[in-house]
């Protein structure tokens, strides 16, 4: 199997720059966090939390897909395995203005496994290929896949290559690879981010073997020096928890990786830039704590940073708490 997409497919799957991305993270990469991230970097590609196809089709679609245009470029991550449902949701992604639609084939949670969502799908590459093909036919957006390097029982190099080849033959050009296997039984999602060893060299080998594919590396990346090393071997980097707990890191992305000045020069400037958005959300009935929790790491490692965290944590949840807590 060559796995070489046609020229039309390559064009179809280009989309936004993925040189530097922030990973989709449940409960963390909400619209409120993404708005903060965008005050710090104009070019970082942001991802939503995973949304299941069932939630989008049978739930409050508008609520799940709500975002601010200021968040662009923005990708929607879907969880699901039914080709028809994935196609329907890919159309919704385009309708709501997203820049990319991404399929989750990396989450190891028991809850999603039972619904054939996430990392368990690495054991069913034909099903993933079917879903990807349906999504590509349903939308003009680039369709990408985020996955592990394997799962227990299917963790060989040949297994990984079979997965990538089958999914690329379905038309997927971009693979975001978490450089660990997922152990589907016996480990929690948190343990699955820490216990299986990182094998960055496997991701490098994927890019070397399939140079026509766009390979983005993910897993345990924390510093710009590490990013530059990975970019010697891959097309892009994706950071997760480091970009959440230390969001000011993102203020260095545009000058470091895109040759442009950062949108803000100081943390205080970033905080002030958030105030109109927070105010409008408060008027919409959103509780302050739903937004302020994403600000807690903004002064990470700075003098007064702990006091800032403590003050926000102790006051944002109080009844009637408003902008005065942040200001």
Region locations from a protein language model:
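Alpha/beta catalytic cores of nucleotide-metabolism and tRNA/nucleoside-modifying enzymes
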Residues: 1-16, 20-21, 26, 32, ...
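Active-site beta-loop-alpha junctions enriched in small/polar residues
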Residues: 25-27, 51-53, 79-81, 106-108, ...
């Amino acid at each position: 199997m060559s796995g070489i997409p046609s020229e039309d497919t390559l064009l179809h799957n280009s989309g936004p720059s993925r040189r530097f991305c922030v990973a989709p993270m449940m409960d963390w990469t909400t619209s409120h966090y993404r708005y903060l991230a965008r005050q710090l970097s104009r070019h970082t590609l942001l991802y939503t939390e995973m949304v299941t196809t069932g939630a989008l089709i049978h739930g409050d679609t508008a609520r799940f897909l709500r975002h601010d245009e200021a968040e662009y470029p923005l990708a929607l991550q879907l969880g699901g395995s039914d080709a028809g449902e994935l196609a329907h949701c890919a159309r919704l992604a385009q309708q709501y203005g997203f820049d990319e639609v991404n399929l989750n084939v990396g989450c190891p949670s028991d809850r999603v496994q039972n619904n054939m969502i996430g990392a368990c799908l690495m054991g069913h590459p034909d099903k993933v290929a079917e879903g990807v093909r349906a999504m590509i036919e349903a939308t003009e957006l680039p369709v990408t896949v985020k996955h592990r390097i394997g799962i227990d029982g299917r963790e060989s190099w040949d297994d990984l290559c079979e997965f990538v080849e089958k999914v690329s033959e379905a038309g997927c050009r971009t693979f975001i690879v978490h450089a660990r296997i997922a152990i589907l039984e016996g480990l929690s999602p948190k343990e699955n981010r820490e216990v299986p060893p990182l094998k960055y060299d496997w991701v490098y080998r994927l890019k070397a073997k399939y140079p026509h594919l766009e390979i983005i590396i993910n897993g345990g990346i924390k510093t710009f020096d590490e990013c530059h090393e990975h970019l010697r071997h891959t097309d892009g980097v994706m950071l997760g928890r480091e970009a959440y707990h230390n969001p000011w890191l993102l203020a260095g992305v545009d000058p470091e990786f895109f040759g442009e000045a950062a949108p803000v020069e100081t943390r205080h400037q970033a905080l002030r830039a958030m105030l109109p958005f927070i105010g409008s959300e408060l008027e919409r009935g959103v509780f302050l704590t739903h937004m302020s929790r994403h600000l807690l790491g903004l002064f990470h490692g700075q003098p007064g940073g702990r006091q800032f965290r403590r003050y926000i944590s102790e006051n944002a949840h109080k009844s009637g708490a408003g902008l005065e807590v942040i200001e």
